[in-house]
């Protein structure tokens, strides 16, 4: 299994290899690098696609300390360095997008373009944060009980085939592993006022049924970026459009990468 020892973390990653332009993709909260398997399959003939597990998720061994999405952005950049990648198209879904924006702000010379899937630059409303905190408290106290994981699966995935696969993964997790990743999510900073600093090309992809991040927030993200293309709306997709609707996501994603990578 490929691991990179960076920033005190043992980061699990998958690298399609090859000499094509590098594309580094980061997963959403409660997900892992496998959520991009369909994108790797669709892109790796022409691109070097790297996917990785963020702190607290998948096979990455987290040091157990608190962290922020700025730390996760630095993990991404350090992984690129470990792999000998000077610059890449960087992107992700939901929290993968949060860290990708921060990577572009941290090291603009290393981020050639951004892929932003079902994500935002701002923070959640107090009402939404309160709901998420209640879910997290239930998980940490009682574990991933059926009612809770079914609700979460329908928010993130909402797919009859994929839901049970991810619920099984969640039930296998130690409940204590939720503490620091959820603190990172719930206490993240708002970077929307800094979007104008990002000058690289960007593509925003968003599910029309995404109830975690609204269409209005996706529009605000696109408008705040100086070089973003029109939003690719994924009809019927919830919060993980690339996972549930790869047949819709992959063609415009590949076309974008061919233009900018």
Task: Describe the function of each predicted region.
Residues 219-240:
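Catalytic histidine neighborhood in serine/cysteine hydrolases
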Residues 237-250:
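Catalytic histidine-centered segment of alpha/beta-hydrolase-like enzymes
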Residues 209-213:
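Acidic catalytic loop of the alpha/beta-hydrolase fold
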Residues 101-106, 112-142:
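Flexible "cap/lid" loop of the alpha/beta hydrolase fold
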Residues 124-130, 142-196:
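Conserved alpha/beta-hydrolase catalytic His-Asp/Glu region
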Residues 9-65:
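Conserved HGGG/HGGXW glycine-rich cap/lid loop of the alpha/beta-hydrolase fold
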Residues 198, 204-206:
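Short beta-strand/loop motif that positions the catalytic acidic residue
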Residues 70-88:
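Conserved acidic catalytic loop of the alpha/beta-hydrolase fold
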